[in-house]
């Protein structure tokens, strides 16, 4: 049970000590095979150069997780190498080619600087994930609740993801007891364009969902915008206004995005306007 989360991340990397890697690999394999998760499943594998990655792939890929998370991704070449390895395993196990997607974890200065080439390196890329803790260590700066030290990285990751047509996932807020801080951090991430945000605690999931889900007011306004577009088309009008404000193409685009998100989350039905 993911407690309302859209996905659960099963970790084979930082959360597992070297002597426990084999046992963790078996546990994750069995969890994917037997537990029947009600949400998407992501497995953070060990780095390509760790000497552990191939074993991870051999155990995990046949179980068909939604995505693999590659830690400390710094180049498109790493993604292409991973793509080739996963493709071989999919073929050998009779799986559809491309079934398993990738979420590169950008947690170094080099990874952030190469964000677009990484995002565009494979059709398997589901989205980019920013790792704030390791990034600040690499930048030799202190990680703070306010997060100003990762502003540049956040903006660059979002821009790269959008340019490549993939999603952008924000770093977790690490103080599990500061609900107000989580709320502000999540709202700020959403304002930058992030699709969603990771959580290290189940208690953060409802707050994150509330921030990243469209509100009823946002849904109602988006529906009004698209209804106004439909009405203007019927009347042959080019200029469109709503509540005294001109409706231009970016507003229409955001309205459609809002309703698409609401549909995915089951907040509204499948019928839209303004197509």
Residue ranges and their predicted role:
Residues 1-275:
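Expand to "…catalyze enediolate/carbanion chemistry for C-C bond making/breaking, isomerization
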